């Protein structure tokens, strides 16, 4: 049947997950982008498909194993292990604080009998008696003295198979390793002025942070990772660790990449944002004691300011979102003061400020990436507004404070009668503060937020300072300007197309023949047959189907199906067979995720209504999972979608994914589902209505939630194509047999077609009503 298309989409939409993840990982790892002119070298249009480009990240990741570095003399940072990797015997490292500690480490090859060897320690020839009785392991020994000319003593030998050694300055001590691998441990020597100890390494070395000491010990005992033991790892100078600090100018343009026709420019600018709120105050009719509305409204503000000696003319438009509606009613008399609705912005609200100026930065702001901004916080405090009553003392709304905190910036387009301007939309989240607001001579006091009555508090404007940065694709020739006709972004283009397509789709409902619709609803539509009405479908079928699946997998239906199996198993296992009110609540919760059991019998009806409304939303998924021979709402929905796709002249492969996804969520919103038990029918609707009745008389009977939940778990779920109201009307006016009633209850397509072919006005009217519900 036609609903097969939705099941195909639900099944196949998850097959694109892996390729999507690979693409996302690849784009997230991209660090820079070179613009290749490609086919655009011969045309006047810029590319509109953009990759992720450079992804800047302020997080500093410290490497686990930093190196190898060439032998050198340096002052190692404290709390860092210097991991030494010598290749020959002899002195491998030495260091001193030039006061009371001269310390060196010597490496001795395996199988060395006691012998005297001469070592060069701190510029002097020193003779030491050394030995290594191990036949296979190398031996590290520490030798130290307290004076430059004193005799050296030997300490803490380390017998090592990997031939690695490490030393660290930390907490007034110099730490080393001793023992025998693979069980070597750390030891230490006390030293004054330990942080000033300079060390000279005579072999390649690595640097490991102290918080990775466990990893350092693993290397000492078991050796370096295999990748460090290849000939491709070449030691570099320690100076490679030095960071060259370059301070970016606040206002500058940097060429990121350049080709023959296009170049990427990074634009850094400081910015001064001035804005103000506006509001609408409407008095209600009557004697003058009541106000209908006090609300925020957008307002544009124009101003000038200096930026690096340049005079900038700027425009800002301030609007709010997520307002909170308050009201006050002083009584029921015509002379009682009342406000039907006044708006307040609080923590759950957002303030949007669209900014545009006449500088060069905004003239080529068409193809933009890496947009970022840093702005200050601003506090907005409300003033007073007096409600002038005909008689009596005037109530005054006063106070209220919110702070605006930057929460992001996006590129937007402002349209005027003559031009479309690319602008920056700054989003601000809010926090409330003192003072609170109140209405004098009323009970309204100590409320927090900023009311719309007087949000500017006699100020001409609020001001925010900061800076923004973006990378824009512009013509390489500075004399050219990116055409403003291209300033509408790809997404805005798509939204405009979708808007036109929605209007066309909705107007096509009148042109659908019901008999053809029923025939189409019974066909097993697949991906290709569904989209065959689009031009060039054969060429674009594969990529178009993939795009539909990608978009569809983010739909509400696909998200719900991902939890369908768990929900069904939970429902089947947790439904109790007890008939108590408490067990009814628990059994319903298996479907509705209602965790609270019902204790008050008086609220049972309301609770059942809530439960059945939520159950009805899941019955669609149950019906999709267990298809019956009857026609369902998704068959009609898919058939209407197919018909409108074939008739449409606006649809394109770009708009198809959006339309299919939107249709799956919005077509036929008023759905009712039923389950049949012998001669009893149980129905539950999306609107929370529920009822049960007998098939032969259509007389209602008490609705047993326990029984309904059991039936839903074990029995097929059927779309109520012909609802109870239509059935009663049909029985009263035409008379139908019990078997016909059963067939209509099961949405038997053969019986439906018979009634439609007979031009039965009641059935036709019901189907036409369903078609009219298929709107976007």
Swiss-Prot record:
Residues 484-516 form a coiled coil. Residues 248-479 are annotated as: Spike body and stalk (antigen domain). Transmembrane segments: none annotated. A motif (KID motif) lies at residues 644-646. Disulfide bonds join 203-216, 318-380. Pfam families: Rota_VP4_MID (PF17477), VP4_haemagglut (PF00426), VP4_helical (PF17478). Residues 510-776 are annotated as: Spike foot. Residues 65-224 are annotated as: Spike head. The record marks 101, 190 as: Binding to sialic acid. A motif (DGE motif) lies at residues 308-310. The record marks 231-232, 241-242, 247-248 as: Cleavage. GO terms for biological process: permeabilization of host organelle membrane involved in viral entry into host cell; virion attachment to host cell. Residues 389-409 are annotated as: Hydrophobic. A motif (YGL motif) lies at residues 448-450. GO terms for cellular component: host cell endoplasmic reticulum-Golgi intermediate compartment; host cell plasma membrane; host cell rough endoplasmic reticulum; host cytoskeleton; membrane; viral outer capsid. Residues 308-310 are annotated as: DGE motif. Belongs to the rotavirus VP4 family. In group A rotaviruses, VP4 defines the P serotype. Some rotavirus strains are neuraminidase-sensitive and require sialic acid to attach to the cell surface. Some rotavirus strains are integrin-dependent. Some rotavirus strains depend on ganglioside for their entry into the host cell. Hsp70 also seems to be involved in the entry of some strains. This is Outer capsid protein VP4.
């Amino acid at each position: 049947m036609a609903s097969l298309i939705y099941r195909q989409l639900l099944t196949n939409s998850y097959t694109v997950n892996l390729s999507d993840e690979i693409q996302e990982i690849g784009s997230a790892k991209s660090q820079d982008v070179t613009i290749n002119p490609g086919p655009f070298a011969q045309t006047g249009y810029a590319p509109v498909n953009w990759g992720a480009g450079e992804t800047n990240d302020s997080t500093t990741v410290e490497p686990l194993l930093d190196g190898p570095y060439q032998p050198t003399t340096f002052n190692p940072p404290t709390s860092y292990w210097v991991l030494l990797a010598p290749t020959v015997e002899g002195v491998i490292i030495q260091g001193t604080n030039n006061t009371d500690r001269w310390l060196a480490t010597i490496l001795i090859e395996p199988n060395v009998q006691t012998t005297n060897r001469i070592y060069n320690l701190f510029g002097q020839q020193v003779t030491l008696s050394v030995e290594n009785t191990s036949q296979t392991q190398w031996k590290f020994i520490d030798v130290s003295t307290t004076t430059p000319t004193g005799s050296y003593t030997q300490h803490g030998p380390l017998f090592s198979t990997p031939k690695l050694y490490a030393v660290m300055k930390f907490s007034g001590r110099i730490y080393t390793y001793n023992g025998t691998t693979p069980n070597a441990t750390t030891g230490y020597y006390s030293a004054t002025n330990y942080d000033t100890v300079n060390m000279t390494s005579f072999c390649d070395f690595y640097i490991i942070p102290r918080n990775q000491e466990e990893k350092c010990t693993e290397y000492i005992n078991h050796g370096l990772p295999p990748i460090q033991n290849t000939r491709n790892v070449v030691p570099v100078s320690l100076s490679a660790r030095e960071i060259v600090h370059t301070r970016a100018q606040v206002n500058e343009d940097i060429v990121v990449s350049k080709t023959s026709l296009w170049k990427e420019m990074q634009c850094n600018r400081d910015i001064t944002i001035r804005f103000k709120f506006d509001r609408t105050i409407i008095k209600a009719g009557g004697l003058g004691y009541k106000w209908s509305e006090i609300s925020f409204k957008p307002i544009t503000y124009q101003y000038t300011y200096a930026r690096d000696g340049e005079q900038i003319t700027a425009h800002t438009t301030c609007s709010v979102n997520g307002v909170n509606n308050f009201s006050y009613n002083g009584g029921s008399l015509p002379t009682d003061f009342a406000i039907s609705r006044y708006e307040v912005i609080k923590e759950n609200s957002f303030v949007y400020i669209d900014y545009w100026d006449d500088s060069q930065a905004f003239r080529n702001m068409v193809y933009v990436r890496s947009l970022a901004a840093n702005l200050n916080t601003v506090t907005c405090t409300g003033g007073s507004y007096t409600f002038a009553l005909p008689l009596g003392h005037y109530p005054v709304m006063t106070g209220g404070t919110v702070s605006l905190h930057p929460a992001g910036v996006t590129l937007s387009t402002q349209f005027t009668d003559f031009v479309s301007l690319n602008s920056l939309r700054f989003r601000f989240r809010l926090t409330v503060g003192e003072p609170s607001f109140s209405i004098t001579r009323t009970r309204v006091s100590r409320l927090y937020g900023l009311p719309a009555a007087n949000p500017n508090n006699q100020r001409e404007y609020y001001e925010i300072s900061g800076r923004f940065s973006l990378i824009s694709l512009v013509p390489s020739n500075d004399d050219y300007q990116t055409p403003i006709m291209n300033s509408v972004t790809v997404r805005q283009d798509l939204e405009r197309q979708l808007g036109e397509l929605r209007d066309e789709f909705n107007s096509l409902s009148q042109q659908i023949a019901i008999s053809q619709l029923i025939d189409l609803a019974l066909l097993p539509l697949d991906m290709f047959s569904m989209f065959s009405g689009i031009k060039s479908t054969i060429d674009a079928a594969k990529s178009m189907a993939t795009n539909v699946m990608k978009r569809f997998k983010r739909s509400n239906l696909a998200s719900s199906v991902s939890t369908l199996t768990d929900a069904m198993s939970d429902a089947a296992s947790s439904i109790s067979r007890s008939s108590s009110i408490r067990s009814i609540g628990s059994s319903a919760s298996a479907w509705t995720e209602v965790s609270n059991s019902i204790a008050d019998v008086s609220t049972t009806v309301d609770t059942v209504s809530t439960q059945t409304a939520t159950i009805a939303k899941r019955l669609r998924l149950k019906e999709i999972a267990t298809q019956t021979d009857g026609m369902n709402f998704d068959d009609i929905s898919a058939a209407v979608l197919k018909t409108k796709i074939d008739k449409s002249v606006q649809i394109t492969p770009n708009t198809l994914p959006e339309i299919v996804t939107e249709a799956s969520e919005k077509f036929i919103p008023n759905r009712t589902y039923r389950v049949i038990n012998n001669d009893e029918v149980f129905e539950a609707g999306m609107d929370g209505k529920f009822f049960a009745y007998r098939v032969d008389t259509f007389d209602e009977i008490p609705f047993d939630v326990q029984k309904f939940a059991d039936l839903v778990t074990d029995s097929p779920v059927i779309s109520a194509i012909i609802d109870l109201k239509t059935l009663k009307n049909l029985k009263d006016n035409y008379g139908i047999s019990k078997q016909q009633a059963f067939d209509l209850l099961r949405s038997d397509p053969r019986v439906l077609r018979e009634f439609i072919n007979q031009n039965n006005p009641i059935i036709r009217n019901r189907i036409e009503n369903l078609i009219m519900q298929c709107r976007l």
